[in-house]
A protein has these predicted regions:
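N-terminal intrinsically disordered, cationic/polar leader segments
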Residues: 1-118, 128-130, 140
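Charged phosphate-binding loop/patch that engages nucleotide di/tri-phosphates or the phosphate backbone
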Residues: 133
Length: 141
């Protein structure tokens, strides 16, 4: 599924026992690479049509890992189901270091017209859960 596509995103997070679902729509570019797939997208929140997200995702076939860089938020994630990784998120008080425990990193981009990516992970302070997230991306040419 290389080339330009429309993207729909469902972002589900649970923080402090409260679930929040955000739906976004936009455009994406998908490229087959030596390591797997490279996906870049820009999407707008369907509810307020104001907040936008720009992300760059590298999907590694051999390791089944995802490297996610959220361009507007100023942080990146290494989602590796085989290991706990770490990230730093900028806050008004400075940088916050969080551990990242990936539960699911899957994708199906081999089709000509449709594709999908699922990223499910938990952010932890030390080893204490902070929030659980599941990002589902649906692509259509």
């Amino acid at each position: 599924m290389e080339g330009n596509a429309q993207i729909r995103i469902a972002s589900r997070s649970v923080f402090g026992g409260v679930e929040d679902v955000i739906r976004l729509e936009g455009t994406a570019t998908v490229e087959k690479t030596d390591y797997g797939w490279h996906l870049q997208y820009e999407a707008v929140n369907c509810e307020d049509e104001k907040s936008a997200v720009r992300s760059d995702i590298k999907l590694e076939t051999d390791t089944r890992r995802a490297i996610v860089v959220n361009q507007g938020e100023g942080y990146g994630l290494l989602l590796d189901p085989a290991a706990v990784t770490a990230t730093q998120i900028k806050t008004p008080q400075g940088s916050l270091t969080l551990n990242v425990k990936a539960k699911e990193v899957t994708w199906d981009l081999a089709g000509r017209k449709d594709g999908s990516v699922t990223l499910e992970y938990m952010l932890l302070v030390g080893m204490q859960p902070l929030s659980a997230l599941r990002i589902s991306l649906f692509l259509k040419k």
